[in-house]
From Swiss-Prot:
InterPro entries: Asp/Orn_carbamoyltranf_P-bd (IPR006132), Asp/Orn_carbamoylTrfase (IPR006130), Asp/Orn_carbamoylTrfase_sf (IPR036901), Asp_carbamoyltransf (IPR002082), Asp_carbamoyltransf_Asp/Orn-bd (IPR006131). One of its GO terms (biological process) is amino acid metabolic process. It holds the Pfam family OTCace. Catalyzes the condensation of carbamoyl phosphate and aspartate to form carbamoyl aspartate and inorganic phosphate, the committed step in the de novo pyrimidine nucleotide biosynthesis pathway. Its EC number is 2.1.3.2. The lineage of its organism: Bacteria, Pseudomonadati, Myxococcota, Myxococcia, Myxococcales. One of its GO terms (cellular component) is cytosol. Gene3D superfamilies: Aspartate/ornithine carbamoyltransferase. This is Aspartate carbamoyltransferase catalytic subunit. Carbamoyl phosphate binds at R58, T59, R108, H136, Q139, G265, P266.
Length: 316
């Protein structure tokens, strides 16, 4: 359990204390990853099924590594090699896999609400690895973990999230978690990519990139979610990059020297980020990737039966 939660589906449901429970445990998990032998027996005898209906590099790989470092058995499932191609429904797929007695199902799906639907039909814990444009809770947690590492705290910090806010599940999870940890969040992007009423979640909205990033402690850059967009919402990627992309010149003129730059990946280089910025000294993008393993270890540990008060196995 994470606090009172059997599942990790939406950070909107998590309290500040429950978010901190995961982040604090992830500190110990990251220490395990620094060892020469990256293996602890914490989840020996447990099993994790990664149920991915969408493509993934970082999330799927890090959940698999997280499970294996904790000594859990990990099964990677792909829709293209399953009975989904024969017409099997999501619920039937999940119930059949759950009949094999896994402890955790990690699911990524193009439909918002898919992980919750699965959770209503299985007895094991369910982790959302991203569902449509709804949420991506583990990404929100690892972004906050990275910011705590780099900034010390999120309390009172200003975070700018720039890009396709309307179609980004990362933006929503980041917004929920960051505001609960005391950050001031600015959202920025084309007006056609800012959802109406988003200010009700505690953010302020800027349509000009400079207004959003000047004075910020961190900037989270997001790609355009082409796979979720029907009719074009922007004139083109060149125009988008000119107005909302971050290049070396803009970064030098507008960003504080100590400002850090995040991106959940994959990066569309030359669109939302220039290569010089993505690979530059202010970028913490690879730190995010590394921290993703530690945070997902913490999530699996807590949901598969670990107790944060008895985390000695992970620390031993």
């Amino acid at each position: 359990m994470i606090g009172r939660h059997k599942h990790c589906i939406s950070l909107a449901e998590y309290s500040r204390e429950e978010i901190l429970e995961v982040l604090d445990l992830a500190v110990s998990m990251k220490e395990v990853l620094q060892r020469p032998i990256k293996k602890v027996p914490s989840l020996r005898g447990k099993s994790v099924v990664n149920l991915f209906f969408e493509a993934s590099t970082r999330t799927r790989s890090s959940f698999e590594i997280a499970a294996k470092v904790l000594s859990a058995d990990a099964l990677n499932w792909t829709a293209s090699a399953s009975s989904v191609t024969k017409g099997e429904t999501l619920v039937d797929t999940a119930r059949n896999l759950e009949a094999m007695r896994p402890d955790v199902l990690v699911i990524r799906h193009s439909a918002g609400g898919a992980p919750r639907l699965v959770a209503e039909h299985v007895g094991c814990s369910v982790v959302s690895a991203g569902d449509g444009a709804h949420e991506h809770p583990s990404q929100g947690l690892l972004d906050c973990f990275t910011l705590r590492e780099k900034l010390g705290t999120l309390e009172g910090k200003t975070i700018a999230i720039v890009g396709d806010i309307s179609h980004s599940r990362v933006a929503r999870s980041d917004l929920h978690a960051m505001t609960k940890l005391g950050a001031r969040v600015r959202l920025c992007g084309p007006p056609t990519m800012i959802p109406a009423g988003i200010e009700a979640l505690g953010a302020t909205v800027r349509t000009q990139l400079r207004e959003a990033v000047e004075g910020a402690d961190a900037v989270v850059m997001l790609r355009i979610q082409h796979e979720r967009i029907g009719d074009p919402l922007i004139p083109g990627t060149r125009e988008y990059s000119k107005l909302w992309g971050l290049n070396a010149k803009k970064a030098a003129e507008w960003l504080r020297p100590e400002c850090v730059i995040l991106h959940p990946g994959p990066i569309n280089r030359g669109v939302e980020l220039s290569p010089e910025v993505a690979d530059g000294p202010q970028s913490v993008i690879l730190d995010q990737v590394q921290n993703g393993v530690a945070v997902r270890m913490a999530i699996l540990y807590l949901l598969a039966g670990g107790n944060p008060a008895d985390a000695g196995e992970a620390k031993a």
